[in-house]
């Protein structure tokens, strides 16, 4: 999603090959957990639902879930030793993933699990919802999103869970 990177098949292959090589190199040098302490915290969350499309899909029976003026979901944080995982209940932007990683205080691997606990569509920065913005495809992306407050609610919830 960076704006200054070519959006081509060749670029996607380059990034994929680089990531694959990195993963294989890391397998040759496994990390040992410093301890085996298990931490699991979760919180039920109510997201304001501003997208009428979700309600219409529910009313038409396309989605087997009740949507009202809000939608209930869940966010979780797990740590095993010095490895930590945080869940995002939808498809998140790099901004939220990087922000979540910044909240994690562990010294080991930091993993963000998207589409975990739920599938609430795109989780976007509030600026995507601003009228007249010039963000490419923002009209489509926001039509597949619960609403502009979702990203901040996830971040605040994770801030409370990651202590």
Predicted features and spans:
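Non-catalytic substrate/cofactor recognition surfaces at enzyme active-site rims
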Residues: 1-163
């Amino acid at each position: 999603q960076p704006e200054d990177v070519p959006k081509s098949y060749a670029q996607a292959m380059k990034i994929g090959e680089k990531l694959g090589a990195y993963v294989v190199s890391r397998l040759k040098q496994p990390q040992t957990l410093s301890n085996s302490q298990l931490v699991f915290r979760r919180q039920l969350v109510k997201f304001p639902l501003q997208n009428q499309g979700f309600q219409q899909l529910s009313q038409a029976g396309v989605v087997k879930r009740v949507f009202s003026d809000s939608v209930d979901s869940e966010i979780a944080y797990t740590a095993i030793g010095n490895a930590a995982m945080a869940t995002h209940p939808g498809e998140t932007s790099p901004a939220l993933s990087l922000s979540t990683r910044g909240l994690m205080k562990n010294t080991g691997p930091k993993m963000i699990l998207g589409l975990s606990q739920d599938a609430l569509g795109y989780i976007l920065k509030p600026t995507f919802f601003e009228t007249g913005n010039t963000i490419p495809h923002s009209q489509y992306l926001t039509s597949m999103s619960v609403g502009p407050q979702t990203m901040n609610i996830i971040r605040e919830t994770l801030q409370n869970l990651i202590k």
